[in-house]
A protein has these predicted regions:
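Flexible coil/loop and intrinsically disordered segments
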Residues: 1-329
C-alpha cells in the first residue's frame, strides 16, 4: 500500500496491472544515479504521516470520512504540505463540507442553514448522500467530547454492507406475500411474549399464523395487522415519513430482515446486536435508546417528540462540527 501510494505520487497510473508498482520501482531504482536511500526515506515519511493521521483522533475521523467518500490519499497528503496541523484540519473540514452539502468553505454555515438543508433530505434516489450525512453525524458525535477516546469502527463499516433504515416503518412497507406476513407477525408475537403484553393480541396473531394457506388471505391478515399497529401506536400513517429524521444507519442483513417491523421490534433487535458485541453505529444505538428525547415516556413507541429531538440534535451536532473550535481542542 505504501509503495503503491509513493509510485502513484511519482505519476504511476493507478490500477495499470498487478505488477505496476514493482515495475515502477524496479525501473526507477536501476537508473544510473538512483538514490535508494532517498526513495526509502520517502516511504518512511509517508508511513509517519499516515501514522500521525491514525494517532490524532480528529485527523483519524476527518480523513476516514473523506476516504470513505472516495478521496485519494495522495490528494489529502497534498493538503498537508506547508500547512500547520490546525490549517490541515481546517482544509479537511472544508472538504467534508463540500462533500456533504456541495458548498465551499466560504459558505455561511448557521444552524438555520443546516436545518434548511437537512429538512429537504428524503429517502430515495441519492441515498449515498444520506449515508454520508448519517456517517458524519456519528463521527461528529464522537469528536465533540475531547475527553473521549472512542473511535468509529471504519473497518467494520467498510466490510459490512450498510443500509439506510427507517426508525419507524412507513405505510408502503406493509408485508404483502404470505411468507412476509408470517415473518412480520412472528417477530411481533415474539416481542409481545417476551414483554408479557397483549395476550388477546398474541392469540389472534397465532390464529392467523396457524391458518391453512388458502385461508390466510389479505382479508384475514389486514385486521390482525391493524390491531398490531394500534397496539404499538403506529396506525397513524402521517407520523411516519421518509425524511432524514426518521432514518439511521443499519447493517444490510438486519435492515433487510426488519425493515418493516414496528419500532419496538426493531429496537429489541438493535439492542440485542449491541449487547452481543456486534458493531452498531453510536447514533443508531442512541436513536433506539431514545437518547434524543429528554422526556422518555414509552420506550416501545417512536413519537413526534422523539423525531423532533432527533432533528434538533442532528442539526446541533453538524452545526458544531462545521463551526466549532473544538475540532482543534
Amino acid at each position: 500500500f505504501l509503495f503503491d501510494l509513493v509510485a502513484r505520487q511519482d505519476g504511476m497510473e493507478p490500477g495499470a496491472n498487478e505488477y505496476a508498482t514493482f515495475n515502477h520501482f524496479s525501473e526507477k531504482l536501476t537508473r544510473k544515479g538512483a538514490d535508494i536511500e532517498a526513495e526509502w526515506l520517502s516511504v518512511k515519511r509517508l508511513f509517519m504521516a499516515l501514522e500521525e493521521w491514525f494517532v490524532d483522533r480528529r485527523l483519524y475521523h476527518l480523513v476516514g470520512f473523506l476516504i470513505w467518500a472516495g478521496a485519494d490519499v495522495n490528494e489529502l497528503r497534498a493538503l498537508a504540505v506547508g500547512a500547520t496541523k490546525r490549517e490541515f484540519r481546517e482544509k479537511l473540514r472544508a472538504q467534508v463540507l463540500a462533500h456533504t452539502f456541495g458548498v465551499g468553505a466560504d459558505a455561511s454555515v448557521t444552524a438555520e442553514w443546516i436545518a434548511d438543508r437537512l429538512d429537504a433530505v428524503n429517502y430515495g434516489p441519492g441515498s449515498q448522500r444520506i449515508r454520508g450525512i448519517l456517517l458524519l453525524f456519528n463521527l461528529a458525535t464522537l469528536l465533540q467530547n475531547a475527553k473521549s477516546n472512542m473511535r468509529f469502527q471504519f473497518d467494520s463499516f467498510k466490510t459490512a454492507n450498510w443500509d439506510i433504515e427507517h426508525v419507524r416503518s412507513v405505510a408502503p412497507d406493509r408485508p404483502g406475500a404470505r411468507k412476509g406476513q408470517i415473518e412480520w407477525l412472528e417477530r411481533c408475537l415474539a416481542y409481545l411474549a417476551s414483554a408479557d403484553q397483549g395476550e388477546a393480541l398474541q392469540a389472534e396473531i397465532q390464529t392467523f399464523i396457524n391458518l391453512p394457506p388458502k385461508e390466510a388471505t389479505d382479508a384475514a391478515f389486514d385486521p390482525v395487522y391493524e390491531k398490531v399497529l394500534h397496539h404499538f401506536q403506529e396506525n397513524d400513517a402521517d407520523e411516519a415519513d421518509n425524511g432524514i429524521y426518521n432514518l439511521v444507519l443499519l447493517d444490510y442483513a438486519t435492515n433487510r430482515s426488519y425493515k418493516n417491523a414496528v419500532f419496538a421490534v426493531k429496537r429489541h433487535r438493535v439492542l440485542s446486536l449491541d449487547r452481543d458485541g456486534v458493531f452498531v453505529p453510536l447514533c443508531t444505538r442512541n436513536v433506539f435508546l431514545k437518547c434524543y428525547n429528554a422526556q422518555v415516556d414509552h420506550v416501545m413507541f417512536w413519537t413526534r417528540k422523539d423525531r423532533d429531538g432527533y432533528r434538533q440534535v442532528l442539526i446541533d451536532i453538524l452545526h458544531g462540527f462545521f463551526t466549532g473550535g473544538w475540532i482543534h481542542g
